[in-house]
């Protein structure tokens, strides 16, 4: 049985949403969970219409639980700044991040350990975590949930002829604001203007670079995540939050 078929029913059956399953070096099996998100009134979670990429001017205007069979326990910091706790499969602890709590991770870990053992899944450590600041976006429900956020998107193939001379035809990576189109599809809107350097004064007469928009379908996307935007002046911005001003 595929790993997804084992893990997802356990996670959803406990009242959570499965975000991602990853296998890493050293036998680490990482399962990322989140609280389910109800679609707002009138926002049906349906696949966006298929369509070719189109580039055009835009209109103006984590708690982590890490378990190991050897019974060792170690507290460490994960890359996203959340806290990870390693324990044996027969005991589990976790810490809260975003809306998923330590108790949530503990509950899922206990059930997964049993299910993985029954199905003979090989792993050295099991880590149950909430999404970090670069949360992956997998489907239409995620797009509806994070519409208006700044995201990083990587296409499966270069933009090619859709670039229309406005960006490099070989470009595959974009960062911008996720928006719904009038036709019900999805687009990312951005400006290629370089940000001002620290201490640089921007003249009032300086015209802003025009916004551009790239329409896409999920089939054309290799990877899509919330942009990990951090304010180094001492305040950490919300993941994927659109810059103010």
From Swiss-Prot:
Family annotation (Pfam families): RimP_N (PF02576)
Record flagged with keyword Cytoplasm: yes
Location in or out of the cell: Cytoplasm
Top-level lineage group: Bacteria
Alphabetical UniProt keywords: Cytoplasm, Ribosome biogenesis
GO terms for cellular component: cytosol
Example GO biological process: translation
Disulfide pairings: none
Chief location bin: cytoplasm
Record's function text: Required for maturation of 30S ribosomal subunits.
Family matches, as PANTHER family: RIBOSOME MATURATION FACTOR RIMP
Family classification: Belongs to the RimP family.
HAMAP family listed in its UniProt record: RimP
UniProt name for this protein: Ribosome maturation factor RimP
Organism for this UniProt entry: Verminephrobacter eiseniae (strain EF01-2)
């Amino acid at each position: 049985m595929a790993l997804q078929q084992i893990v997802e029913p356990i996670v959803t059956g406990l009242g959570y949403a499965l975000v991602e399953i990853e296998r890493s070096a050293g036998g680490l099996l990482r399962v990322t969970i989140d609280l389910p998100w109800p679609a707002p009134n009138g926002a049906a979670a349906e696949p966006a219409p298929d369509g070719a990429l189109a580039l055009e001017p835009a209109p103006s205007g984590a708690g982590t639980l890490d378990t190991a069979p050897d019974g060792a326990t170690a507290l460490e910091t994960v890359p996203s700044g959340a806290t990870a706790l390693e324990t044996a499969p027969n005991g589990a602890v976790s810490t809260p991040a975003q809306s998923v709590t330590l108790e949530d991770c503990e509950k899922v870990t206990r059930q997964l350990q049993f299910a993985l053992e029954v199905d003979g899944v090989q792993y050295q450590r099991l880590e149950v975590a909430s999404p970090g600041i670069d949360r992956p976006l997998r489907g239409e429900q995620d797009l509806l949930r994070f519409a208006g956020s700044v995201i990083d998107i990587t296409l499966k193939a270069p933009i090619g002829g859709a670039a229309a001379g406005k960006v490099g035809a070989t470009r595959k990576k974009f960062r911008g604001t996720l928006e719904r189109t009038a036709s019900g599809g999805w687009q990312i809107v951005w400006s290629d203007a370089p940000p001002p350097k620290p201490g640089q004064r921007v003249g009032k007469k300086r015209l802003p670079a025009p916004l551009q928009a790239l329409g896409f379908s999920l089939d054309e996307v290799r990877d899509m995540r919330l942009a990990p935007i951090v304010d180094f002046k001492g305040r950490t911005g919300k993941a994927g939050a659109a810059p103010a001003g």
